[in-house]
């Protein structure tokens, strides 16, 4: 029989908290889920053991416009975060996001910066990991335009290299085979 894993109705008594995203670990044992307060774009991520329904101590704050993308070895996940707002939580302009990696069982303050670009404060990104774990692929956008850049990092490099470095269309990676990456475009 079907069971409810996460019930957003239990997040708050007044119903102002909502489910902002979910991501199940590759082994199917954990789920990262995001909670939003009052319709805000800000997300707080939590991690739950699916079998026991117990929350792990991992809490990720100041995430926005981001999913959680698990490492293939289930050790943690990637997410986009912003610096903690100084004053007006819902008014301050948020710039200079960082792509972070959170290792399960550690404090968010110890998360690793995977990518940032202070010269481009409006850029945002999403990451995908190739099935063979050979590539990390960044899709980089500027604002809400439906065009993106594509950067790739190989397992033998710490640097993301631009593959498509202009906003000339929409590019989505669909699969990898060996050293080849298939990209679908909409120009």
State the predicted function of each range.
Residues 106-108, 114, 128-130:
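Preference for long, solvent-exposed alpha-helical segments and helix-linker "stalks"
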Residues 11-17, 35-44, 59-64, 80-98, ...:
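A flexible loop/linker signature enriched in serine peptidases of the S9 family
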Residues 49-53, 103-107, 154-158:
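Short loop/turn segments that connect beta-strands within beta-propeller blades
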Residues 13-34, 61-80, 119-139, 159-162, ...:
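Conserved beta-propeller blade repeats
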Residues 4-13, 54-59, 112-116, 159-164:
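A short beta-strand motif characteristic of beta-propeller blades
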Residues 55, 73-74, 101:
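The structured alpha-helical core of multi-pass membrane proteins
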Residues 149-150, 167:
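Acidic/His-leaning functional-site neighborhoods
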Residues 1-54:
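Well-ordered mid-protein domain cores that form the structural environment of catalytic cofactors
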């Amino acid at each position: 029989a079907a069971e409810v894993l996460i019930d957003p109705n239990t997040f708050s008594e007044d119903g102002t908290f909502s489910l902002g995203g979910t991501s199940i670990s590759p082994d199917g044992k954990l789920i990262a889920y995001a909670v939003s307060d009052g319709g805000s774009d800000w997300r707080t991520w939590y991690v739950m053991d699916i079998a026991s329904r117990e929350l792990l101590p991992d809490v990720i704050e100041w995430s926005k416009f981001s999913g959680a993308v698990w490492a293939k070895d289930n050790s943690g996940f990637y997410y986009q975060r912003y610096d903690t707002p100084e004053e007006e939580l819902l008014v301050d302009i948020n710039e200079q996001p960082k792509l972070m990696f959170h290792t399960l069982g550690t404090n968010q303050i110890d998360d690793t910066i995977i990518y940032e670009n202070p010269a481009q404060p409006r850029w945002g990104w999403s990451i995908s990991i190739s099935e063979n774990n050979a590539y990390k692929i960044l899709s980089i956008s500027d604002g809400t335009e439906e065009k993106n850049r594509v950067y790739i990092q190989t397992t033998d490099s710490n640097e993301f290299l631009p593959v498509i470095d202009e906003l000339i269309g929409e590019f989505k990676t669909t699969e990898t085979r060996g050293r080849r990456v298939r990209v679908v475009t909409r120009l």
